[in-house]
């Protein structure tokens, strides 16, 4: 298994890059999110890789971050999502955006990606739903996720509300709210919505 490659970037032709590692050139498919972060040709690059082996093909996929690679691996475990579709998903959405789409169960966002229809988007959301941590997403989004927000989010999730409902409730909270007041405001909001 090839888990990481460090070498000189020789060629960039989306979605393919060529990385020279001590005289051996590795062709690596990368999502556009990684492609846009690559250094100039001739510069040193490190990619976290996934070696894809099937009967008729051996491919190397590269990612700028371990999170992208881990998400790619999760995506390709889903029925109907192959390596190319997984790459397309990561090219169309950042890791954070995809996590937010899963937490909020936003299939419309996913259907905008070429090759993802409504049924595939719904299956993807269903299978990833339990694998995504909403508290981590709140932090990733940089949404000024204070400890108060995290505590309110955790409490609402523990009460059985889904990620989409909780996100909507958190958006309507007033600034500087305490945990107990935030939970009360959120519960009032959620009782009106249902």
UniProtKB/Swiss-Prot annotation:
Residues 140-143 are annotated as: Flexible linker. The keyword Kinase does not apply. Residues 1-64 are annotated as: Domain I. Its main location: cytoplasm. One of its GO terms (molecular function) is four-way junction DNA binding. Homotetramer. Forms an RuvA(8)-RuvB(12)-Holliday junction (HJ) complex. HJ DNA is sandwiched between 2 RuvA tetramers; dsDNA enters through RuvA and exits via RuvB. An RuvB hexamer assembles on each DNA strand where it exits the tetramer. Each RuvB hexamer is contacted by two RuvA subunits (via domain III) on 2 adjacent RuvB subunits; this complex drives branch migration. In the full resolvosome a probable DNA-RuvA(4)-RuvB(12)-RuvC(2) complex forms which resolves the HJ. Keywords: Cytoplasm, DNA damage, DNA recombination, DNA repair, DNA-binding. Residues 144-194 are annotated as: Domain III. This is Holliday junction branch migration complex subunit RuvA. InterPro entries: DNA_helicase_Holl-junc_RuvA_I, Hlx-hairpin-Hlx_DNA-bd_motif, NA-bd_OB-fold, RuvA, RuvA_2-like, RuvA_C, RuvA_C_sf. The RuvA-RuvB-RuvC complex processes Holliday junction (HJ) DNA during genetic recombination and DNA repair, while the RuvA-RuvB complex plays an important role in the rescue of blocked DNA replication forks via replication fork reversal (RFR). RuvA specifically binds to HJ cruciform DNA, conferring on it an open structure. The RuvB hexamer acts as an ATP-dependent pump, pulling dsDNA into and through the RuvAB complex. HJ branch migration allows RuvC to scan DNA until it finds its consensus sequence, where it cleaves and resolves the cruciform DNA. One of its GO terms (cellular component) is cytoplasm. Has three domains with a flexible linker between the domains II and III and assumes an 'L' shape. Domain III is highly mobile and contacts RuvB. Belongs to the RuvA family. HAMAP family: DNA_HJ_migration_RuvA. GO terms for biological process: DNA recombination; DNA repair. It is found in: Cytoplasm. Residues 65-140 are annotated as: Domain II. It comes from Nitrosomonas eutropha (strain DSM 101675 / C91 / Nm57). Pfam families: HHH_5, RuvA_C, RuvA_N.
